[in-house]
Amino acid sequence: MKKKGLLIILSGPSGAGKGTVLNEVRKTYKNLEVSVSVTTRAPRAGEVNDVNYHFKTIEEFKELAHDGAFLESECVYGNYYGTLKSEVFDKIQKGLDVVLEIDVKGAFNVIGKYPDAVSIFVCPTSMEELKGRLAGRGSETAEALELRLRSAMGEIKQATKYGYVVVNDDVKECADDVIAIIKAEKCSTKINKDFINTLTGGSI
């Protein structure tokens, strides 16, 4: 019997390195599909449409929202982001594990609709480290940097509401922690109820 895949939520403040950690996870954990989010923000250097994001106009985004295409959607820093249902549930039914790299508010929206989601929060080692990473991007004004840091503090305070917290002190070690969480969840009773029910002929 083919088991359903997991829905995995990966969150963390901007600059925590969650994207880098996720890329490292995908190098060794092959049963993982990354849900490509829809956004109205402009592409950053090196980003490719339909690979990093589905880039849409505000009008296109609102049309998708009106059609009920999103599992969740949020406005962050003046830009809209959304997770397409089609990017998630078709793959889960095929046995693939799907990861959503989304912010805290979006994560709680998904958990409210899909309580079995595995939620993982990526933390920096310190606020000083986080500030250094953000400043190192060279793309933030001093005012924008302070806004990001205040937002990050608020997000980190929500980390205790997640199922798991990992600290990104070393990318490889942090990725290994994420993989260990996924593997443990794959063996959990909540994921294997259908399998046990089939094995026993529906006697439970």
Annotated model-derived regions:
Residues 18:
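Conserved lysine of the Walker
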Residues 11-13:
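P-loop (Walker A) phosphate-binding loop of NTP-binding proteins
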